[in-house]
Amino acid sequence: MKKQEQYVDNWIRERTGLGSALTAENLRAWQQERVREAEIYAAEHAAFYRDRKEALLSPEPGQHFFITAEDIRRRPEDFLCVSPKKIARIITIPTSGSTGRPKRIFFTEEDLMATADFFTPGMAYMTEPGQLVTVFMEGEQVYSIGGLLRIALERREISTRVHGFVHDLKEAEQAAQGADCLVGVPGQMALLAEAAPKLRPKTVLLSGDYVPQSVVRRLESIWECEVFQHWGMTETGYGGGVECGAHCGYHLRDADLMIEIIHPETGESVPNGTWGEVVFSAFARKGMPLLHYRTGDIGRFCPDTCGCGGVLPRLDKVMGRIENTIFLHNGDAISIHQLDEVLFALDGVHDYAAKLKQNPEATLSLTIEGDADPDMITEFIHKKWSGLEIRVNSGIVERKRKRSIVREK
């Protein structure tokens, strides 16, 4: 669908003023200027940045300035650059565990409307004027995800029905009736597809959680629809990047965010195509500009060009969290959910356990519960990680609440 359209790139051309001069190099130079302006603004108005002004504005050679989720949890108000009276919405993000402090993210009305500005071209890949979109994400209030999507879609004469998260499948099915596009989190959309296979949305947008390809394939098969994916988080102001009809990476919100990929240990930028930690600077935000924010997510810029003909770097599918990812000596990375994608797509794999040893060659040892062919398993893993030595054994796997790849020395 619309594989040649470049809605987000065109929006960036207009927002940045670069027009026909838009290239990856010119965009990065423009972004770096905006980040510098945001650093000066933040150092003047926010206590956190003011207390670290020298490190922010004049770092020592080889030093890098970053902020983390823990910085925000500790004193979120210290990141404010405006009066609390100008804050239109505060989002509280709980921390796993009973004692962890939550993150609180502050937005002005201007910040939130900028998100709607990005949603407008982003949703154009999967919708047409005159259609109906049902949103299975939070809320009716104007500055919720649903409310901002409503604002964005109304600009293109598209109707929006905001249902909220799926709690009752019958009610959700009723809300989805007649919709051309459904927006929701992957697991809930998969459940809805199984419960209501006769729904026939033309498109589905998945967001809010990691998107397994098995879910994409299931929705495409049951509903015979085209599935799009979105990347973003509360810290980015919800919007971050969205797939176009070519489905090869996220077209980024480059007019408001500068995305970088760094080595998680050294903090140095890594070459395009290399996996590392996703870092962003929300340079356009006025209320709480997060600058050089380490997300803890593993990603990379796509090494190839997009089928739509776009000229800007795209973010590849985010692989998960750093703490659940192992970086290989050859520059690749592997995580438990990546293995899930490969192994659970194979017939005869009921469960598995994995161990990885790097000494220095990487050896992946698998215990497979089921009757899958070991040679087939090795072949499929080598398609994704050609540098791994694979050892496959059959056996009973210990059930654990949280699975991970065991690192062996």
Identify what each model region corresponds to.
Residues 180-191, 224-228, 247-256, 406-409:
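A polyampholytic, Gly/Pro-enriched intrinsically disordered region
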Residues 284-386:
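AMP-binding/adenylate-forming catalytic core of the ANL superfamily
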Residues 133-134, 278, 366:
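Conserved hydrophobic helix-helix packing surfaces used for dimerization/oligomerization
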